[in-house]
Regions:
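Active-site-proximal helix-loop-helix substrate-binding element of RNase H-like nuclease domains
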Residues: 107-129
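Glycine-rich loops and low-complexity Gly/Arg-rich segments
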Residues: 57, 61, 113-117, 191, ...
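Conserved kinase catalytic-core segment
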Residues: 122-191
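A diffuse structural propensity rather than consistent per-protein peaks
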Residues: 102, 117-123, 250-257
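Conserved ATP-binding subdomain of kinase catalytic cores across diverse folds
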Residues: 1-112
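A structural signal for well-ordered alpha-helical scaffolds and beta->alpha junctions
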Residues: 16, 54, 121, 233-237
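C-terminal catalytic region of ATP-dependent kinase domains
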Residues: 169-258
Length: 258
């Protein structure tokens, strides 16, 4: 495992909820995410396992042939406390003239409407349909639903308008950005004891699965993954038919990764 204790750090350029630093490594810029203490008192874990969720989640997306940010795990020793931490190192894909267009910010582009867009499927579609720049709208919708299917597999409850988007290159060409921000996947707040309990109790596991929901709403109701996957909209159905066979094919590799 790479040791970043004496790495070449740059002034931080990244925001968001977790603590981050900017790293120059092998001639490339990386965002380094650090583990944080949980914000909720309802968990017994001392640190959120979001760095492992980020790395494994992105690796699973890549194994399913969906572009995602390149990541690796590394160790870092705090110079003041001497405490060693495991961090996730995420390659910045906004290099060589590329620029990330967060989906929420694209919604602000629509000055012809006074509407405030929220995390509903209807609003996602409305934003896409109102694009007035050159982009493949079908490809954006397909990317959204492909990402949705894999987020369901990962149990990600926190894919919203701020953590996915489009990538614009130096020539102005626009396409879906690589998937990033998978830190809420794979139950990062669950303790090892809780996970072992779920593995041993089939009924408890089913309850856990049935309570998994997306942050999105559809037709006025919060989306529970198990419900919408049973009766999917047409575009989601197409993504299910495309992604599920990939999941089955990649299952041994995913198991080995986890």
């Amino acid at each position: 495992m790479v040791d970043l204790t004496h790495a070449k750090w740059r002034p931080n350029r990244y925001g968001g909820s977790e603590k981050k630093r900017t790293l120059l490594f092998d001639g490339k810029i990386y965002m380094v995410k650090f583990p944080e203490p949980p914000r909720s008192k309802k968990t017994s874990v001392s640190y959120i396992g979001n760095q492992f969720s980020e790395h494994i989640g992105c690796q699973i997306f890549q194994s399913l042939q969906i572009p995602a940010q390149n990541t690796f795990l590394a160790k870092y020793c705090e110079p003041v406390t001497g405490k060693e931490k495991i961090v996730v190192v995420c390659e910045d894909f906004c290099q060589n003239g590329n620029r990330l267009l967060e989906f929420s910010k694209i919604g602000h582009h629509d000055t012809g409407s006074d509407k405030t867009y929220t995390t509903t499927i209807e609003d996602v579609y409305e934003i896409i349909e109102r694009f007035d720049f050159a982009v493949n709208k079908f490809a954006i919708k397909k990317h959204f639903w492909n990402m949705f299917v894999v987020d369901a597999l990962l149990g990600n409850p926190d894919r919203h308008l701020d953590n996915w988007g489009l990538l614009e290159d130096s020539a102005g060409r626009i396409k879906p950005a690589p998937v990033y921000d998978c830190g809420s996947s794979l139950s990062p707040l669950s303790s090892d004891e809780r996970k072992n309990l779920l593995l041993q109790d089939e009924n408890l596991m089913k309850i856990e699965e049935y309570n998994l929901c997306s942050v999105y709403r559809h037709q006025g109701k919060r989306i529970f993954y198990h419900e919408i996957l049973k009766t999917p909209p047409a575009d989601l159905h197409r993504s299910i038919l495309e992604i599920v066979p990939r999941i089955k094919f990649a299952a041994p590799r995913i198991d080995a990764l986890i």
